[in-house]
Amino acid sequence: MKKKVLFIDRDGTLVIEPPVDYQLDSLEKLEFYPKVFRNLGFIRSKLDFEFVMVTNQDGLGTSSFPEETFWPAHNLMLKTLAGEGITFDDILIDRSMPEDCASTRKPRTGMLTKYISNPEYDLEGSFVIGDRPTDVELAKNIGCRAIYLQESIDLLKEKGLETYCALATTDWDRVAEFLFAGERRAEIRRTTKETDILVALNLDGKGTCDISTGLGFFDHMLEQIGKHSGMDLTIRVKGDLEVDEHHTIEDTAIALGECIYQALGSKRGIERYGYALPMDDCLCRVCLDFGGRPWLVWDAEFKREKIGEMPTEMFLHFFKSLSDAAKMNLNIKAEGQNEHHKIEGIFKALARALKMALKRDIYHFELPSSKGVL
């Protein structure tokens, strides 16, 4: 089997990069990145990646960065990591300055020649982990993808590097989860004589939504699911609204449910259960179970015929179709006077229940069922 590698940056990734001079040149400046020990130790013990440290240390060995100020902190860092089971198969340090344009300086690949075009290594299955766009560019240059330790990828978009970023996060918990269990993404295309629907989602996203169904109020409700569950959600619908709203709403629920079910995968490590949310004058309760047995209990009444362009009779139908397609048990109850608040509260409660139930723990990566199947 070919070897996979994690090419790991040092400053800003393993340790906090010192502000002002960006030099880790004293023991007082040594501060480890939050959660790095538990998660990198987990990756080292559970997965088959080689660990290679790849770092630029500007002017190391010159008067601006004497070696005697570098090695004590560096060696203590390595010793501390090793004490937690984190060792490196190779450590590559470039000492040049940016203006030198050295072939060995990241994002150039001169230090990595032993891994490039080497049949023993699976670079497509490898990752660069780092906090700078140059780390993502290095991933591009050696033919792998990057885990970018930043929240925003705006800088990557400016440089045309966003497609080489597999994950953007500042949380080592997410890094370990991604490498161990993968991202829970899915895409469903549902086409009938009445509708053409695309649903794409990432259960481990940031709540980014791009929704267009042709029904403004329905869009607003679906946005609550993405925003308040934390999933990235794209829904594009072309439906026969010239007939009525029924097919658009029903088929969207089916496609969304199928997409959630597909993205869930094995369900290992998930919480499985979730519940609840009050809103203004309303109390809306949603309890759910991803146990594989669809069922809907609905206790909510609406006096108006429509809210926005959405018939209130379709609310129950939406959640029944969603429950069936996602193979989840839903129990929904809403009390209150304001009809808009009531249904919006239900959608928000569903979202928060989803967030709770979909939470995944790789350190307890078991199926949440005594039967051994969900």
Curated annotation (Swiss-Prot):
Annotated pathway: Amino-acid biosynthesis; L-histidine biosynthesis; L-histidine from 5-phospho-alpha-D-ribose 1-diphosphate: step 6/9; Amino-acid biosynthesis; L-histidine biosynthesis; L-histidine from 5-phospho-alpha-D-ribose 1-diphosphate: step 8/9
Cofactor section: Mg(2+)
Its EC number(s): 3.1.3.15, 4.2.1.19
Annotated keywords: Amino-acid biosynthesis, Cytoplasm, Histidine biosynthesis, Hydrolase, Lyase, Magnesium, Metal-binding, Multifunctional enzyme
Ranges where the record places region Imidazoleglycerol-phosphate dehydratase: 184-374
Region described as Histidinol-phosphatase: 1-183
Active site: 9 (nucleophile), 11 (proton donor)
Top-level division of the source organism's lineage: Bacteria
Reactions it catalyzes: D-erythro-1-(imidazol-4-yl)glycerol 3-phosphate = 3-(imidazol-4-yl)-2-oxopropyl phosphate + H2O; L-histidinol phosphate + H2O = L-histidinol + phosphate
Record-linked InterPro entries: HAD-like_sf, HAD-SF_hydro_IIIA, HAD_sf, His_synth_bifunc_HisB, HisB_N, Histidinol-phos, IGPD_sf, ImidazoleglycerolP_deHydtase
Gene Ontology annotations of biological process type: L-histidine biosynthetic process
Positions contributing to Mg(2+) binding: 9, 11, 131
Listed GO CC annotations: cytoplasm
Record's subcellular location: Cytoplasm
One MF annotation (Gene Ontology) recorded for this entry: imidazoleglycerol-phosphate dehydratase activity
Similarity annotation: In the N-terminal section; belongs to the histidinol-phosphatase family.
NCBIfam families with a match to the protein in the record: HAD-SF-IIIA, hisB_Nterm, Histidinol-ppas, PRK00951.2-1, PRK00951.2-4, PRK05446.1
HAMAP family (alphabetical): Bifunc_HisB, HisB
Name recorded for this polypeptide: Histidine biosynthesis bifunctional protein HisB
Organism: Bacteroides fragilis (strain ATCC 25285 / DSM 2151 / CCUG 4856 / JCM 11019 / LMG 10263 / NCTC 9343 / Onslow / VPI 2553 / EN-2)
